[in-house]
Amino acid sequence: MSSSVHNNTGPVQLPEERRFLSASEAAALERELLEEYRFGRQQLVELCGHASAVAVTKAFPLPSLSRKQRTVLVVCGPEQNGAVGLACARHLRVFEYQPSIFCPARSADALHRDLTTQCEKMDIPFLSFLPAEVRLIDDAYGLVVDAVLGPGVRLAEAGGHCARALATLKRLSIPLVSLDVPSGWDAEAGGDAKDAVQPDVLVSLAAPKSCAGRFSGRLHFVAGRFVPDDVRRKFGLHLPKYTGTDCVASL
């Protein structure tokens, strides 16, 4: 039930506290950050990319990995989630992992171009194609980051290159980390579609979306410490507290 507080004009209804946001609420929260708080799009992508990389370090700590397991394939789509993936790859390189990037469909967006240039300048390799034989990927990498689609992007809209990439990701044996909404999932209903990936780790950006309630993988992180407290209250978000200086929290 929703709660209420009193001011000089009488009780004020507060939203019901919950963990998950609908697709429309998630879009409204992002608009609040962009329009009311004057966050820039690049700023949000950078914050989410950094936090996503930190989540990877918590799920797969570098000291516990063999040299081969430190190799990370980051698959980046042409929309905003792909930009987050590019930023994530750059931060993983700073954290001494060994990322490579595959973009099934390159974006002409200026932000994508800038992030791509940054990754290239840091000598992060870009694959020209994704092997269809999954054994080659399983043998070459320790884990994969799925930044292909994200919320609000349907597979039918993304094109055949993204569909083929997802068909390959679905068959991998190595761990899969999805950013925000696992590719192929409906942001509301979850991942029952035949083309949906089933990640081992989910990193929800800003706040978990409704589909995260159906996630049954190993670890679920929320990367939203940058969301101001009054915005959390406005949207009725009841999430774990962040520890110390951590930018992610485990759900």
Curated annotation (Swiss-Prot):
Disulfide bonds: none
Family matches, as InterPro entries: YjeF_N_dom, YjeF_N_dom_sf, YJEFN_prot_NAXE-like
Keyword field contains Cell membrane: no
UniProt entry tagged with the keyword Iron-sulfur: no
GO biological process: hematopoietic stem cell proliferation; lipid transport; membrane raft distribution; negative regulation of angiogenesis; regulation of cholesterol efflux; regulation of Notch signaling pathway; sprouting angiogenesis
Domain YjeF N-terminal: 26-239
Tree of life domain: Eukaryota
NCBIfam families, per database record: yjeF_nterm
Name under which the protein is recorded: YjeF N-terminal domain-containing protein 3
Source species: Mus musculus
